[in-house]
Amino acid sequence: MQPAKNLLFSSLLFSSLLFSSAARAASEDGGRGPYVQADLAYAAERITHDYPKPTGTGKNKISTVSDYFRNIRTHSVHPRVSVGYDFGSWRIAADYARYRKWNNNKYSVSIKELLRNDNSASGVRGHLNIQTQKTEHQENGTFHAVSSLGLSTIYDFDTGSRFKPYIGMRVAYGHVRHQVRSVEQETEIITTYPSNGGGKVSLSSKMPPKSAHHQSNSIRRVGLGVIAGVGFDITPNLTLDTGYRYHNWGRLENTRFKTHEASLGMRYRF
């Protein structure tokens, strides 16, 4: 818990410093007023699972993030809305986004021989019995970056034209939810191979299914990110915005969750 508290304190301190810079810029530039922005973003989501070393201090730590979510590479398209204030060269904004739920299914089968009974002998007509166990394993998992509520400080470069590149920093409070449901079904099969050359005969019997394993967790973290992009002033109050942002959602137990986003949107200044 201590690293999380340190990250939160550092994030708030960093934000206060940036916002104070924006306030000073407002007094110098005269201010330009509030604005709203709507974006459509394409997000590449990266989930990386780290395992503690056998001799490490966290070797006995149980993670609330299932091994099911290991090295996931997925993507989604989602909307984002922002409300902010334009000070001239500096902008501050609060944004909110919801992400698409990631779903995945895994199905595996393993077959193990339990018993082999060879009843054939020299000069005696017999048959061969083989008893096997078939285990079917079905897993259904979801990983959902439910929402991200962020605060950003952005600096616009004045190029003397309608094009204005910008860079910025972002602090965000993210909510991630994930769950796994796992079911196993075992079937015992006895296969008979007649010695007279006839076709084999198989008899199967399903064992009582094991209780389903269900795991569900909800995690909230404060993370940091960077922003870059280019704005094009269509009118003095309307701007076409193309941007990129990288966000590290913070460490979710022994899992790292990061997003790379490219967006296209419109910004209107009042």
UniProtKB/Swiss-Prot annotation:
Stretches that traverse the bilayer: 36-44, 77-85, 90-96, 143-157, 163-173, 222-234, 238-246, 262-270
Annotated signal peptide: 1-25
Stretches of the chain found on the membrane's Periplasmic side: 45-76, 97-142, 174-221, 247-261
Membrane topology label: Multi-pass membrane protein
GO annotation terms (biological process): monoatomic ion transport
Complexes and interactors: Homotrimer.
Family according to the record: Belongs to the opacity porin family.
The protein's name in its UniProt record: Outer membrane protein P.IIC
